[in-house]
A protein has these predicted regions:
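Gly/Ala-rich beta-loop-alpha elbow adjacent to hydrolase catalytic centers
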Residues: 94, 98, 102
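Short beta-strand/loop motif that positions the catalytic acidic residue
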Residues: 210, 216-218
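Conserved HGGG/HGGXW glycine-rich cap/lid loop of the alpha/beta-hydrolase fold
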Residues: 8-62
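Active-site loop/oxyanion-hole signature of alpha/beta-hydrolase fold enzymes
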Residues: 49-93, 262
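Flexible "cap/lid" loop of the alpha/beta hydrolase fold
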Residues: 103, 107, 115-147
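Catalytic histidine-centered segment of alpha/beta-hydrolase-like enzymes
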Residues: 248-261
């Protein structure tokens, strides 16, 4: 599906019906990894309209010259929300850099939000300010690695904590294929300059704490964004659950899929209670 905004057409996928959840993917990928991570949760849960968009310069949404920084990316997301679910209360979720944008949505629309999900969240856009553990492989599969070309194996497993065929398929399907179709020139214009990649405002200096049920899930071995920084924002979310999962890095969605699904399901229970609805079957 496409949403025609003033100066850009945003591609998105909408699944299910009911209370809307806006899902924001990570940097240099597209909405497919969010679908892979979260759709299994909704197999036995009705009443939720999941809206997965491709951010500008990612997936099937083009980059535009006028989008030069994170603030303008957020403007597109807010405009998209206003057009697709005008005047409605909603839930927002984001992974990695999408979690940074999701907090931007909270900053501007907290009064309309019934829930917040942050997985492997990017907290600071400045690489030098992140607290990250070194990469480690906890579950090695030497036979699998030997089947791959050395360059491919290095590319696949340089950040993975678990070496398995499931992880290989996940990265190939949800990350490498998305890298190929994204506008890398557009992405680099923002990502390679910290002043462009960061918001111009402190996204975590909320005027008031966000009262909606929140789930923050980080990987204990995440060598991309770490886990320690996410703890620092917890006081913004008095209804927040904070979880750090062992045996998982930035690919937490596949490395600890069952635990993630259980946590998201429990978070949705809390959101439904908070919003005064029940959709469990």
């Amino acid at each position: 599906m496409d949403c025609e905004l003033k100066d850009i057409t945003v591609h998105y996928e909408m699944l299910g019906a009911g209370r809307p959840i806006i899902m924001l993917h990570g940097w240099s990928v597209d909405h497919r990894h969010m679908v892979s991570d979260l759709e299994p949760v909704f197999g036995h849960r009705d009443g939720w309209k999941r809206i997965y968009l491709d951010l500008p310069g990612h997936g099937l949404t083009p980059g535009k010259d006028w989008i030069t920084n994170q603030d303008k990316l957020l403007d597109v997301v807010l405009d998209f929300i206003d057009n697709v679910i005008p005047g409605q209360r909603f839930v927002v979720g984001g992974a990695s850099a999408g979690a940074y944008l999701a907090r931007g949505v909270v900053y501007h629309r907290s009064a309309s939000i019934d829930g917040l999900l942050l997985t492997v969240p990017l907290i600071t856009a400045y690489d030098a300010k992140r607290h990250m553990p070194p990469h480690v492989t906890l579950a090695a599969d030497t036979a699998l690695v030997s089947e791959l070309e050395p360059d491919e194996a290095e590319g696949l497993f340089q950040s993975a904590v678990v070496q398995s065929r499931k992880v290989v398929d996940y990265i190939r399907t949800n990350f490498l294929s998305a890298n190929e179709i994204g506008d890398q020139v557009f992405q680099a214009k923002i990502r390679d300059n910290p002043e462009n990649y960061a918001f111009s405002f402190d996204v975590d200096a909320l005027p008031n704490p966000c009262p909606a049920p929140t789930l923050i899930v980080a990987g204990r071995q995440d060598s991309w964004v770490g886990y320690r920084d996410a703890w620092e924002i917890l006081d913004n979310y008095p209804r927040g659950t904070f979880v750090v999962l062992d045996r998982s890095g930035h690919f937490l969605g596949v490395e600890q899929a069952d635990l993630l699904h259980a946590l998201v399901g429990e978070w949705l229970d809390r959101v439904e209670e908070y919003a005064g609805v029940s959709s469990r079957v």
